[in-house]
């Protein structure tokens, strides 16, 4: 099934992200958690290209295939290009086709310190265009409510986003954010710029102090005062912090659905408990 067709149903699309285990762990180590997460029956599950920079291309396809064939949920395979040649991309696309994976989230990927990027693909839009020329894949792209860290300003960022859509992305999934007003302003900028494809809001339930620090460092998401106060109050009580993080994410999602967003993409961090609590809280609203 092509993921883009979900946005024609009139309901709020609700999807998850999961990731493969590190190379040092057997791939089967995540199957139990992924089965629990899949049992919540999201509209689709996306599988990241790697886990903390140490994952495997083939593991992404293997897990995406497992989710689709064995757990009965449509899957989306992430694919990055900055450190890949066309031959690398061709191998991945062939693997996806062979295993019935129809949906790809096309990403540039992170620059690796000390590693010279390959020359075949400079931007995610280059990858979108290439995938579109290579077969009948449904292509998703990423977007950044608080502006991509390498963009000079909002204008350049939206220009790059529009280019990604023009290159073949049929829908978009946003980077995480904690302030819904930031997301609504982003949607308005995208609309004015003529970005008229469905956009899913990326929600990250923060469940530990270390996760907050890591996520802010990685993506530069701003922390609204309400969020910061919650985290400060419970930062020495792990279970309370987890539950407060879940509650904050639920509040975000309820507000987003009320504002008529196209979809919610939940970054589950492979945590069935968190995914279940949030799904139970919002499923009647979708």
Regions found by a protein language model. Name each.
Residues 21, 43-63, 110-119, 170-183, ...:
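Glycine-rich, proline-tolerant flexible connector loops at the mouths of alpha/beta enzymes
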Residues 17, 45, 96, 164, ...:
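Conserved, mostly hydrophobic/aromatic
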Residues 18-21, 48-52, 78-84, 109-111, ...:
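Active-site beta-loop-alpha junctions enriched in small/polar residues
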Residues 3-4, 27-36, 52-73:
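Glycine-rich, positively charged N-terminal anion/phosphate-binding segment
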Residues 13-29, 75-87, 140-156, 233-247:
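Active-site mouth loops of central-metabolism enzymes
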Residues 29, 81-95, 118-122:
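Glycine-rich anion/phosphate-binding loops
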Residues 119, 123-144, 194-246, 251, ...:
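Active-site pocket-lining/capping segments in soluble small-molecule metabolic enzymes
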């Amino acid at each position: 099934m092509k993921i883009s067709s979900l946005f024609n149903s009139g309901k709020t699309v609700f999807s998850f992200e999961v990731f493969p285990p590190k190379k040092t762990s057997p791939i089967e180590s995540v199957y139990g958690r992924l089965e629990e997460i899949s049992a919540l029956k999201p509209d689709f599950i996306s599988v990241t290209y790697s886990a903390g920079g140490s994952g495997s291309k083939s593991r992404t396809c293997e897990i995406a295939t497992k989710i689709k064939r064995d757990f009965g949920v449509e899957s989306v395979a992430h694919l990055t290009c900055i450190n890949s040649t066309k031959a690398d991309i061709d191998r991945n696309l062939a693997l996806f086709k062979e295993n019935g994976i129809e949906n790809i989230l096309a990403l540039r990927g992170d620059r690796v310190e000390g590693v010279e990027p390959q020359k075949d693909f400079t931007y995610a839009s280059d990858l979108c265009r290439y995938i579109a020329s290579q077969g009948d894949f449904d292509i998703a792209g990423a977007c950044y409510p608080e502006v991509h860290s390498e963009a000079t300003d909002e204008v350049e960022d939206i220009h790059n986003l529009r280019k990604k859509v023009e290159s073949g992305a049929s829908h978009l999934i946003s980077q995480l954010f904690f302030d819904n007003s930031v997301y609504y302003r982003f949607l308005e900028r995208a609309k004015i710029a003529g970005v008229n494809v469905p956009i899913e809001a990326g929600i990250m339930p923060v469940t530990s102090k270390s996760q907050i620090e890591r996520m802010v460092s990685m993506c530069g998401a701003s922390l609204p005062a309400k969020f910061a106060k919650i985290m400060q109050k419970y930062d020495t009580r792990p279970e309370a912090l987890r539950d407060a993080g879940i509650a904050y994410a639920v509040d975000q999602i309820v507000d987003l659905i009320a504002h008529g967003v196209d979809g919610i993409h939940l970054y589950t961090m492979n945590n069935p408990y968190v995914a279940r609590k949030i799904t139970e809280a919002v499923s009647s609203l979708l």
